UniProtKB/Swiss-Prot annotation:
Enzyme Commission number(s) of this protein: 1.14.15.6
Family: Belongs to the cytochrome P450 family.
Gene3D superfamilies according to UniProt: Cytochrome P450 (1.10.630.10)
Protein's recorded name: Cholesterol side-chain cleavage enzyme, mitochondrial
Chief location: mitochondrion
Originating organism: Macaca fascicularis (Crab-eating macaque)
Gene: CYP11A1
Length: 521
């Protein structure tokens, strides 16, 4: 169930913008060879103002953007602009000016120049909320030394291989419970299969997974009767994303000062997220002080952070809140897209299942070993993120002047990598509309160089990357072992932007039980 008054997550919401003549999601070849300007040139760089642009009037540009494309199709706006301007352009929307790039060679130059404390674009309504209500912030919104201090401490508990191996049994338990949910539905249906939209189930699965990893405790989101407090948190996360979109290109303080419905609708879920996350964290802390460490097994990320003393309790709470809020819609959306692509490409699904079953037999059921034996499955997650990235761009503010495509880009300029457009550009991916995980297994580095960008790059890549990769891989292992996934309509469902990229309309899957014994006879 969604919060009252909210549109479904997978339905396009046009808001107050008029959506006219949306371009198709297929990208044509760039007109200029990508080797020109990507490397070092002996010519003097051209000035910033000569970079191709629709014009310097940000408010007029914003008006045309709203009228001709619409906020919820910003990914296609990038596609159109690259078709018009080729590998680089600059655009001012409202009061935010950016340079956009698509070529992996330019992406490499950008990220290799980012410095030790990279800064990215901060979502304006999120910053405004934290500043006005004086909420503590974590690594998502921190900068410079404060960001570095928290990130180093968190990396040890969230990214380090010796730590992430502890996540395996926690994530596997949740995945097996999800499989049980589908088996019960198949049995209840009485038709030998189950058909339906499982997007809400995937959100609950993702919330159950991230809370189990952080707190070492289950929240009951996959039970017959769903935990209502957990569901309220999930709904608040979606509403937070949804209500952010309309304030991306206009000063959020305008919405706040005039007490608009848009601002109120954004504040309400943020308050829920903070209150619930604080409650989870403080209850865990209180129980730990009361009971002490009576367990010798791994008890989750929060337990380790509390015992480390490298971060204050307020900083821990802020970062736990961000991990909870960032670990639901993002992971669940990628899993939905992955199931969608597998259902449309049954030969690929059969290849993935064969790899998983062989890995299970060879590893004799040990999940850590299984994970080492499924390179194609891991490549399929990369392929899903190529076609369906969660973010529409990756952003960096330049530390120093940088020459890209023969143009001098001044320090402090916001440069954005349009990863949706990049993933579908035939100049950089052969047959880009085809779901082909094997492309990522090539030993030719030119095929994959700075193209796997679903989680970002460098020291400021997604903090939850290792959790998400393990969570998705283990989920898919369990699903492939138990079900054959099909879809009735093979046509493209389309993509819409609600701060993250998601299906434009609900996807209905059909799950058939998979008989492993029959395949071994």
């Amino acid at each position: 169930m969604l919060a009252k008054g909210l549109p479904p997550r997978s339905v396009l919401v046009k808001g107050c913008q008029t959506f006219l003549s949306a371009p198709k999601e297929r990208l044509g070849h760039l007109r200029v060879p990508t080797s020109e300007g990507a490397g070092i040139s002996t010519r003097s760089p051209r000035p910033f103002n000569e970079i191709p642009s629709p014009g310097d009037n940000g408010w007029l540009n914003l008006y045309h953007f709203w009228r001709e494309t619409g906020t919820h199709k910003v990914h296609l706006h990038h596609v159109q602009n690259f078709q018009k301007y080729d590998p680089i352009y600059r655009e001012k929307l409202g009061n935010v000016e950016s340079v956009y790039v698509i070529d992996p060679e330019d992406v490499a130059l950008l990220f290799k120049s980012e410095g030790p404390n990279p800064e990215r674009f901060l979502i304006p309504p999120w910053v405004a909320y934290h500043q006005y209500y004086q909420r503590p912030i974590g690594v998502l919104l921190k900068k410079s030394a404060a960001w570095k201090k928290d990130r180093v401490a968190l990396n040890q508990e969230v990214m380090a291989p010796e730590t992430t191996k502890n996540f395996l049994p926690l994530l596997d338990a949740v995945s097996r419970d999800f499989v049980s949910v589908l088996h019960r539905r198949i049995k209840k249906a009485g038709s030998g299969n189950f058909s339906g939209d499982i997007s809400d189930d995937l959100f609950r699965f993702a919330f159950e997974s991230i809370t189990n990893v952080i707190f070492g405790e289950r929240q009951g989101m996959l039970e017959e009767v769903v935990n209502p407090e957990g569901q309220r948190f999930i709904d608040a996360i979606y509403q937070m994303f949804h209500t952010s979109v309309h304030m991306l290109n206009l000063p959020p303080d305008l919405f706040r000062l005039f007490r608009t419905k848009t601002w109120k609708d954004h504040v309400a879920p943020r308050d829920v997220i903070f209150s619930k996350a604080d409650m989870y964290t403080e209850n865990f802390h209180w129980e730990l002080r009361q009971k002490g460490n009576v367990h010798h097994d791994y008890r989750g990320i929060l337990y380790r952070l509390l015992g480390d003393s490298k971060m204050s309790f307020e900083d821990i709470k802020a970062n736990v809140t961000e991990m909870l809020a960032g670990g639901v819609d993002t992971t669940s959306m990628t899993l939905q897209w992955h199931l969608y692509e597998m259902a449309r490409n049954l030969k690929v699904q059969d290849m993935l299942r064969a790899e998983v079953l062989a890995a299970r037999r060879q590893a004799q059921g040990d999940m850590a070993t299984i994970l080492q034996l499924v390179p194609l499955l891991k490549a399929s997650i990369k392929e899903t993120l190529r076609l369906h990235p969660i973010s529409v761009t990756l952003q960096r503010y330049l530390v120093n002047d940088l020459v890209l495509r023969g143009y001098m880009i001044p320090a402090k300029t916001l440069v954005q990598v349009a990863i949706y457009a990049l993933g579908r550009e035939p100049t950089f991916f052969f047959d880009p509309e085809n779901f082909d995980p094997t492309r990522w297994l090539s030993k030719d580095k030119n095929i994959t160089y700075f193209r796997n960008l679903g989680f970002g790059w460098g020291v400021r890549q997604c903090l939850g990357r290792r959790i998400a990769e393990l969570e998705m891989t283990i989920f898919l292992i369990n699903m492939l072992e138990n079900f054959r996934v099909e879809i009735q309509h093979l046509s493209d469902v389309g993509t819409t932007f609600n701060l993250i990229l998601m299906p434009e309309k609900p996807i209905s899957f059909t799950f058939w039980p998979f008989n492993q014994e029959a395949t071994q006879e």
